[in-house]
Amino acid sequence: MKVILLGAPGAGKGTQAQFIMHKFGIPQISTGDMFRAAIKEGTELGKQAKALMDQGKLVPDDLTVALVKDRIAQPDCAHGFLLDGFPRTIPQADALKDAGVKIDLVLEFDVADEVIVERMSGRRVHQPSGRTYHIIYNPPKVAGQDDITGEELITRADDKAETVLERLAVYHQQTKPLIAYYIAEAEKGNTRYERLDGTKPVEQVSAELANIFNQ
């Protein structure tokens, strides 16, 4: 099963990707991880990507698609893969299609912006240990303090409300058009499109995913 995950940052894609990987034995492919691996291995594509990144330039779509094609040709992808964080734009989706990569299933995690802001801006972290809390869903015993050490909890820069809103604006501008793109592809019979309510409890979303994969 070749799967694309769509959804705003904080919609729960990462949590459910872990569930799918463990339950169905499909590797998760993140373009960020791929670039890091290609650069570390010193592959030709890795060298090209590194040269651009070192200059602060964006890696062009054709190079990213070439890297994705390389990665999905590896033996662990024989039974499928999960693409997370790619494609992000319509040109990238077109490039993937033109490269002959057939997608079986597109999963959209649908969560309203205000819920995402509440989820992410409510996170608190104990930096030394990495323990995470949430002021509503998983509060520490004493507000602002780590349960074990009593040390101060912080809000990561990425989780601050204004940063979350900026990331959501980019998502709506760049990536949301992909939802219409893949719904149209599904209507043509080129893929299957499923929308999940990301506000439901994690276990419920996982159960719905298992049903989708078993259909």
UniProtKB/Swiss-Prot annotation:
Where do the record's region annotations for NMP lie? 30-59
Question: Does the entry feature the keyword Nucleotide-binding, yes or no?
Answer: yes
GO terms for biological process, alphabetical: AMP salvage
GO terms assigned for molecular function: adenylate kinase activity; ATP binding
The reply to whether Transferase figures as a keyword in the UniProt entry is: yes
Task: Tell me where it resides.
Answer: Cytoplasm
Pfam family of the protein (one): ADK
GO CC term (a single one) = cytoplasm
Task: Report the EC code(s) recorded for this entry.
Answer: 2.7.4.3
Tell me its family: Belongs to the adenylate kinase family.
How is this protein organized at the quaternary level? Monomer.
Domain text from the record?
Answer: Consists of three domains, a large central CORE domain and two small peripheral domains, NMPbind and LID, which undergo movements during catalysis. The LID domain closes over the site of phosphoryl transfer upon ATP binding. Assembling and dissambling the active center during each catalytic cycle provides an effective means to prevent ATP hydrolysis.
What is the recorded name of this protein? Answer: Adenylate kinase
Gene field? adk
